[in-house]
From Swiss-Prot:
UniProt KW keywords: Activator, DNA-binding, Early protein, Host cytoplasm, Host nucleus, Host-virus interaction, Inhibition of host innate immune response by virus, Inhibition of host IRF3 by virus, Inhibition of host RLR pathway by virus, Metal-binding, Modulation of host cell apoptosis by virus, Oncogene, Transcription, Transcription regulation, Viral immunoevasion, Zinc, Zinc-finger
Oligomer status and interactors: Forms homodimers. Interacts with ubiquitin-protein ligase UBE3A/E6-AP and thus forms a complex with human TP53. Interacts with human NFX1 and MAGI3. Interacts with human IRF3; this interaction inhibits the establishment of antiviral state. Interacts with human TYK2; this interaction inhibits JAK-STAT activation by interferon alpha. Interacts with host DLG1; this interaction leads to the proteasomal degradation of DLG1.
Location(s), subcellular: Host cytoplasm; Host nucleus
Zinc finger residue ranges, unnamed: 37-73, 110-146
One matching Pfam family: E6
InterPro entries assigned: E6 (IPR001334), E6_sf (IPR038575)
Family that this chain belongs to: Belongs to the papillomaviridae E6 protein family.
Name the record gives this protein: Protein E6
Organism from which the protein derives: Human papillomavirus type 16
Keyword Signal: no
Function: Plays a major role in the induction and maintenance of cellular transformation. Acts mainly as an oncoprotein by stimulating the destruction of many host cell key regulatory proteins. E6 associates with host UBE3A/E6-AP ubiquitin-protein ligase, and inactivates tumor suppressors TP53 and TP73 by targeting them to the 26S proteasome for degradation. In turn, DNA damage and chromosomal instabilities increase and lead to cell proliferation and cancer development.
Gene Ontology terms: cellular component: host cell cytoplasm; host cell nucleus
Amino acid sequence: MHQKRTAMFQDPQERPRKLPQLCTELQTTIHDIILECVYCKQQLLRREVYDFAFRDLCIVYRDGNPYAVCDKCLKFYSKISEYRHYCYSLYGTTLEQQYNKPLCDLLIRCINCQKPLCPEEKQRHLDKKQRFHNIRGRWTGRCMSCCRSSRTRRETQL
């Protein structure tokens, strides 16, 4: 049976949104902080805590307590969001014209792992004429890591 936790951050204005700020607020480090997944409530593995920070994801709060997301739930809910909330796709050049900004100035996350794409990953989409996808009003593409893993998966399925 779960014990009821006391809310850490009652005031929504004082809630840290990113992991480094949460660590500072709790006077701990990214190497020591213990977080649960907002979906499955399992404790994140240390690697998942590091991945959460690397992906620059936001901490969410339930009853004043901070939560992150584990890898399994992140990938699962990313796929659900893609299926339920896909709007449309555009080539990079069209996206730049639509926003009147270069791709490097636009936040585009990986459709699978939610990591922000780096300039090289965005350029790869341009070079290979791959589209970016608008899901729930946010732009997504594929990071190098997810591209490699999906290619490997396809090759082993043959």
